[in-house]
Each structure stands twice: as C-alpha cells, then as structure tokens.
Amino acid sequence: MGDGPRGIVLTTAEIASEGLDVVLDAVARVGATALSTSLGVLVQGRPGDRTREPPLDVAGEARLLDRPLWGQRELYLKGYEPHEADPALWAGVAYPPPPIAPPEFRRDVPRQIIDGARARGLAAHIQVSPYTLPGAPGGQTTQSGHGGGVVADRPLRIDGTVAKRIVAGHGCLNNPRVRALGRARLAEAARWYGDVDGIFLDWAEYTCYFLEDAFACFCPHCRAAAEASGIDWTRIEADTRALWDRLHRLTPADLDRAIARGDWPFAMAGDLTDFPGYGELLRFKAASVRAALADLRATLDSAGGAGVALEANGFPPPWCHLTGMDYRHAGQIVAATRPKLFTFHWPMIARWWTETLLTWNPTLEPDATLRAVQACLDLPTPKSEHRRGLADYGMPRPDEAHPITMAALTRKLDQAVGLAGDSAPCQAYLHSYRPAEEFARVLAAAQSSTARGCWVQRYGYLSDEKLDILRAAWRGSNISQS
C-alpha cells in the first residue's frame, strides 16, 4: 500500500456513549492519521422510532456491535440535526429540513470531535449522504428510517417497478428534487463545518444489492437527461429489456459458461457486446454520477468550502460498473475515492441475486446458480468455507468468517486503483465487522494492494482486540495526513 491516510470512521453516538477523550485517544493510539464522523445528534429511541443500530440492511438481524452503546449491542437510535437549518438553503427544496435536536440533548458533539481530532494531530473529515431519501434506510443522515421514501423519487427499473427491499434508499441522481436535496444537505454541512479537511460522500451512485437494481433507472428524468445528451434512449430500453428477458431464460449450459468465464456480472446471459444498449445505459449512469459529483463540488465551492476536499465512497469492481462509479472520471472531480470492502454484504448479495435468478428460472439447480453468481461477481470462496448451500448465505454472525478470499480483496482494490489511473488517489475502505483474526488478514490484504491509504469503518465494531491488531498494522506503516 502506498503512502496515504490511515483513518477511522466513527459516529457521534459512540462519542456520547464512551466519551470524547476515550474514543479519540483510542483512535490516535492505533496510529491513525485521520478520522471521519457523522454529524447528527443521535439518542436512544424505540422500535419503530427511527432506525436500528447496527443497520438492519433488510435481513441483518445477526449483526451486533463490538462496542456497546449505552450498554447495548443493538438498539434503536433517533437522529436530530445539531443546528437550525438555514431557510435560504432549503428554498425550493421539495423536502423539509430535518429537525434540530431538543435543548436537553448536546448539540456540540460534532464540533467537539473535529476540534478534538485537530488537537491530537488528526485530519478531520465528515461524511454526508446527499441523496438518501428521508424515511429510507442507509446513509449518514438524521432522517433515515425503515420505509421507502417518496416512491416517485426512487430509481425506476426497466419493468416499471421500484424496489421494495432497500439497503440504500437513495433517489435517482437525475431527479431535480433529489439533486436539490443533496445540494441543501451539503451546503448545510459546509455552513457549520467548512473548516474540515474533507467531506466524504456516501451513496452518490446507484446501487446493486439486488440484481433487479442493475436495471435502473428508467424514470422520465433519466430519459430527458439522456436525450438532451444525444443518447438513443429507445435503444437503451430495448437492449436492457432484452438482457432482462434473457436472464429469465437461463439454462444449465449458461451457468456452466458463467462459472468457467465470469468476466462481467451477467456473463450467464452472454457477452456485454450482445446487448450494446445496456452498455450504453452503464455509460449513461457513469455520466449521471459524474454530473452529480460536479454539482456537489460546485455547491461546496459556492458555500465557502473551496478549500475542503470532496471525496467519494463507491462499490468496488465489478459492481462499480453497474452503479455508475467510474473511478477514473469521478477521480477528476473529487480528491479521493474509497472502494467499500464491506464484505458482510457480499454473501447477502450472492444470495439475493441467486434467489432472483431462481425465481425467474425455477428449473435451475440452486447450487450451480449460486456458483455462477459468485463467479460473475468475482467472489471465490476460501478452502475453509463452511457454508454448504444457499440458505447458509446471509449476514454473518459477529464471530463468523465471511465467505471471501484475501486474494480477491487485494484484486478488487488493485482493479479500482487501475480504473482510477492517474486521477485522484484510491483508498481502501474496510469494514471491521468480522472476527478479529479475519480482520488482521483483511488489513494485510489491503496493505498488499496498490491503494493509497486505508480507512476502517467503524469504531463501534473495533473491539479492544481489533484495536490492538490495527495498532500493530499501522504503527509500522508509512503514514501521512493527506
């Protein structure tokens, strides 16, 4: 791994639970050079009152925190904003600004984290989810929930449906209502925290947890944006529908071909060149992400944040090709990109994609279908894999190894770095929800990659044992604060 930041992501809830000095001293002690925090005022809630922590992610009940919040490894949190919204920033936005925290709750925790980081020589970053819809899950917003958000603002699939199962409830990036929401959120963050070193954007791309999500978005706003750019939308619709229909007519031979040569996510249906309009859709989604990032960069500049680095999280290869996260061209707009190696999601994705294909093709053999999906997504299983069938694939337990190989992790990082080329630095973004022994191996896999820096999500999953592992890995590394 090249020279770059060593960062830890945390939330204001962890500070409120353990104490500012306890958490920040622990971050500094492991050899971190940077931290990134959420901005909300997070307090204990009730079931049905905002969101579960850890996030449910549709079927993630097994996930628990390593570091309890107020004595609990799972709980419900209610979020508020630490500051009164500026009405001028929200003028013309279809969504109302989020409510400010009641006076009985501390509103200064985000500022304390930033100032405390600086006092310890750490670079201070914040994280913003510009396009996560209010009431929908996912993202770093105080308005997240377990609902679906405004359906009309969600990505529309080629079959005319909108997802009912949601991990990340973002709106369509070409929807003016959604873009206005993102600008208001980012401008509010810059208004109060314009002195930070950087702002990481989460979910400034499309999603693909479910196979069907790779066939979006076909809303009127996307059509208008495409046609304004001279793109043949009719061809995109026809070839995307052709690929969709082809995936409903799979044979065992198609699965065998994918297992032998899974060189893109839908290799079981043929080559991408067989569906040129779908390839055009992927290029259009990448252009949509770039336009959204450029819009946010301009927003930050006009809000007084010209000196603040804008950075972007994204899916790693091969998913990034479906989500629109074009690391090379995105890296010409943002100052850094972070491929997310959140590997607890990967068995869930493999299962969900497989279940969809089996629903569409009920005569296929489940194990062969799963192997084909794993091959297409470059998810080889380790020799020690204990899972024996589709039913075993889901959110891993806290002490359960993930069905991954370290070579695949390094390969995905190197592929993202290769895609980025000479644009902005590509930094590893690891998740610490996993057994401690595996965490050590994941760190080593990242350090053997060509990524330029490493971030760990999240303090709440870093047990004391994992903090010791992180300290051993990072204290001997070439460290910078960039």
Question: For the regions a protein language model found, what residue spans apply to each?
Answer:
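Substrate-binding cleft of secreted/luminal carbohydrate-active enzymes
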Residues: 38-45, 334-352, 378-392, 396-477
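Short, acidic/polar
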Residues: 14-28, 178-190, 318-331, 436-447
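Aromatic- and acid-rich polysaccharide-binding/catalytic face
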Residues: 202, 237, 241-278, 325-397, ...
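Aromatic- and acidic-residue-enriched segments that line the glycan-binding/catalytic groove
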Residues: 45-75, 132-165, 203-269, 331, ...
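Aromatic-lined carbohydrate-binding/catalytic grooves of carbohydrate-active enzymes
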Residues: 32, 36-103
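Substrate-binding cleft/loops of secretory-pathway carbohydrate-active enzymes
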Residues: 132-144, 208-210, 306-349, 434-451, ...
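Aromatic-lined carbohydrate-recognition surfaces of secreted/lumenal glycan-active proteins
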Residues: 9, 123-135, 200-204, 233-262, ...
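Active-site-adjacent "subsite" loops/lids of carbohydrate-active enzymes
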Residues: 6, 10-11, 80-115, 123-194, ...
